[in-house]
Amino acid sequence: MAGAGPAPGLPGAGGPVVPGPGAGIPGKSGEERLKEMEAEMALFEQEVLGAPVTGIPTAVPAVPTVPTVEAMQVPAAPVIRPIIATNTYQQVQQTLEARAAAAATVVPPMVGGPPFVGPVGFGPGDRSHLDSPEAREAMFLRRAAAGPRPMALRPPHQALVGPPLPGPPGPPMMLPPMARAPGPPLGSMAALRPPLEEPATPRELGLGLGLGLKEKEEAVVAAAAGLEEASAVVAVGAGGAPAGPAVIGPSLPLALAMPLPEPEPLPLPLEVVRGLLPPLRIPELLSLRPRPRPPRPEPPPGLMALEVPEPLSEDKKKGKPEKLKRCIRTAAGSSWEDPSLLEWDADDFRIFCGDLGNEVNDDILARAFSRFPSFLKAKVIRDKRTGKTKGYGFVSFKDPSDYVRAMREMNGKYVGSRPIKLRKSMWKDRNLDVVRKKQKEKKKLGLR
């Protein structure tokens, strides 16, 4: 790609700036391009780690002038290095972020929540380095990689053995080749790689659910070993497509980017419970439920419960003959029992009907008085031996008003072949209890 304008170059170790009017990047020697890449990577590392920037923008092929950078110069290595592979930039960026996470332990740790999206060392007031294409590319890659980040916590233990699986193709592959800053040589990757033997912080160790401190350190070392193997494969396949799986785009620190193992303590409580509670103890627990019942059968209430139903049953037995009241009648100095009075209602209003013909029966007498609403019963008295009528009967009413109307309207009316004669029934006066009561009252009054 030949530049139309002057293409500046970054100075090497004490070398002057090479202005080239009309000269493009292909005209530069290998050492100059190497110096430019090393300077850019050093500047990018400084921005990522949050170190103060000297205000020198990164060299871009279309910028007319670039000030000299003395503090960021790195001595050129005379050794000829292999061509940078397509995945080298992403690999170096991953290692830089791992180092930034290790250095960020001094800063107040970030409370657990959504994954970190912005650059590591950017502050709210420092926005001067956001204009560089490297910073914008890193921010874009982090935002693109932040979407499927929660899914990285679900894979099982297999992810602890090898390097992380490659994610979806990121946007850097769609950018023009020169838009991305060329990565440093492979020799500088070893210098920029953070020490993998450092113990993880307590906050990172606490992310494991069922692992202890030693198990967490072993998992971090295993993941780091897998990362070194992946970088070695990338170095062997330089000049072509990446020979091994590699992560495209930035990732979280090793302890955070590692997929957490499955929580092992979850099935343990069930096994422990099953082991501690043998099948012989389960019915014992079930038998504890009816224990509150013993307070009920206390000695005094129990005796009362046994004694109470007996008198109740005796009362019922005694009450049955009491219900069958004996209706003892008395008249003319003699007494007899009349069970027929039990067929009548004790609270009714009864009328005596006399001078009935032989043809009058209960139905005829009831038909004659049934026009009154509160009519209850009508009966003709007959001889028990012959069955002939004795010439009289009784009619009862529930309402006293109907009783009075029947006395007025039905007295002297024909029922059958004869007119009947009505008067008030005196059946209560012939009751033995009533007779004795009246006799006592007469004695008190001195009548007898």
UniProtKB/Swiss-Prot annotation:
Post-translational modification Asymmetric dimethylarginine, affected residues: R149
Gene Ontology annotations for the cellular component aspect, listed alphabetically: cytoplasm; nucleus
Residue span of region Disordered: 1-29, 286-324
Modified residues (N-acetylalanine): A2
Subcellular location field: Nucleus; Cytoplasm
CDD domains for the chain: RRM_RBM42 (cd12383)
Alphabetized Pfam families for the sequence: RRM_1 (PF00076)
Biased composition (Basic and acidic residues): 313-324
Compositionally biased spans, kind Gly residues: 11-27
Phosphoserine PTM positions: S132
Molecular-function GO term, any one: mRNA binding
Protein family according to the UniProt entry: Belongs to the RRM RBM42 family.
Subunit and interaction comment: Interacts with HNRNPK.
Name of the protein in its database record: RNA-binding protein 42
Gene: RBM42
